[in-house]
Regions:
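Dinucleotide-binding Rossmann-like beta1-alpha1 core, especially the glycine-rich loop
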Residues: 53-133, 259-261
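Helical element adjacent to the flavin cofactor pocket in flavoenzyme catalytic cores
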Residues: 147-203
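Glycine-rich FAD pyrophosphate-binding loop
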Residues: 28-49
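Beta1/beta-strand and adjacent pyrophosphate-binding region of the FAD-binding site
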Residues: 5-19, 36
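Short beta-strand to alpha-helix junction loop
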Residues: 63, 67-70, 96-105, 146-165, ...
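C-terminal catalytic lobe of FAD-dependent flavoproteins
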Residues: 302-402
Length: 402
């Protein structure tokens, strides 16, 4: 267990995944002062970041998400210059596949991505062209595909690790194995956080702890509807998966027709997602993926990637992530002055992390984490108050599986 370096700090960030790491880094860049980064386990090791597929895409069913993704993608592309280190960005191309019933929705969402993309190409292509681009795909049942040539994936663990390294170089202090129990306040202003080993006094507290991130705010009467779901990811051998033009070549892909997602992993392996399920017991180890779950997920993917039917498994991961009712994050000041939330990313936080951290840091530094101050327009749809007000984010052109 790491000792607390500062009993007094200028800011405490709770949560050592990619969101917490990115925000801590941005706060340090802004010269906020002494920053403590707390995590109940090991930073970058046990949370949703380490179980993320790392998909990088502009395509979403809500324009708010598209705009944040478009702001984040250049950071992944220029990671070594902007952050330092290597985030593992690979430009494989991203495709979104739909059946006939969602063809019009795909055109609508692709147009929104085009609007946000600037100079980047976002195309709607037919199954025949899709097959030419990625010979490893079976295109039966696909009516249209949205194709982003500059989409792809990155390595969430590598990205988070380099963010943490950059933050530490700027003076951020890690405190591992420290559970944040409750946010402390006096007269409407944050005074710190009570942890499992004592108190850290600070005028700013950022809760970015994924599935359990909102719990320390409950003591202040702040209820954020974030529920835990178990997420799963598996890796399998597929020679040529990441070799463009090879017989087994596949893109980074979300397939609405089968409810699956997958991507290459290097040249000769691929990752695929296993559907999430509710899991609210936050105090215990997460159950590993079962043989039945893996078989079901592989069978679905084999409808699109025939070679997956016989692909040997190379590894699996499972963990918890926090999901909101509208499957969009909660970002913004809440409750007493000095409390800021960045949680509930619902399986989609990695690709948004650079933009969220940049904009959140501006609201925290320039506005003191006070609601209504230094407002960043791109974050407005994600405010904690939207659920109480009955204004969840509603997809303009929804699919069955996004």
């Amino acid at each position: 267990m790491s000792p607390i370096v500062h009993a007094h700090a200028d800011a405490v960030v709770v949560g050592g995944g990619v969101i917490g790491a990115a925000i801590a880094h941005q706060l340090a860049l802004a010269g906020i002062g002494r920053i403590v980064l707390c995590d109940q386990g090991r930073v970058n090791a046990q949370g949703a970041t380490s179980r993320s597929g790392g998909l990088l895409r502009l395509h979403h069913t809500a324009r708010a998400d598209t705009r944040l993704a478009a702001r984040s993608l250049p950071v992944f592309e220029q990671w070594s210059d902007v952050i330092g280190g290597d985030c593992g960005y690979r430009r494989t191309g991203f495709v979104m596949l739909v059946g006939e019933e969602h063809a019009a929705d795909l055109r609508f969402n692709a147009a929104a991505a085009t609007e946000a993309a600037g100079y980047r190409r976002v195309e709607v292509i037919e199954p025949a062209e899709l097959k030419e681009l990625y010979p490893g795909l079976r295109t039966e049942g696909v009516a249209l595909a949205a194709y982003e040539p500059e989409g792809g994936y990155a390595d969430p663990m590598a990205a988070s690790a380099s963010l943490l390294t950059a933050a530490y170089r700027l003076g951020v202090s890690p405190s591992e194995g420290i559970r944040a129990l409750k946010v402390l306040e006096h007269a409407g202003t944050v005074t710190g956080v009570l942890t499992s080993i004592g108190r850290i006094d600070a005028p700013l507290v950022v809760l970015a702890g994924g599935a359990w991130g909102s719990a320390p705010a409950e003591y202040l009467g702040i209820h954020i509807p974030v529920t835990a779901r178990r997420i799963g990811l598996a890796q399998a051998e597929l020679p040529g998966a990441g070799r463009r033009g090879a017989a087994a070549s596949v893109p980074t892909c979300i397939d609405d027709t089968t409810g699956s997602y997958f991507r290459p992993d290097g040249l000769d392996r691929f990752y695929f997602g296993v559907p999430s399920k509710p899991d609210t017991e936050l105090g215990r180890d997460v159950e590993p993926l079962t043989e039945a779950e893996l078989e079901s997920a592989l069978n679905a993917i084999a409808d699109r990637v025939p070679a997956a039917a016989t692909a040997p498994l190379a590894g699996t991961r499972s963990g918890l992530d926090g999901y909101t009712p509208d499957k969009r994050p909660v970002v913004g000041a809440a409750g007493p002055d000095g409390l800021y939330l960045a949680l509930g990313f619902s399986g989609g936080g990695f690709k948004l992390a650079p933009a969220v951290a940049e904009l959140a840091a501006k609201e925290i530094v320039e506005g003191g984490a006070v609601p209504g101050k230094a407002v960043q327009e791109l974050l407005e749809p994600y405010r904690p108050q939207r659920f109480l007000a009955g204004r969840p984010i509603r997809p303009e052109a929804p699919y069955d599986h996004m």
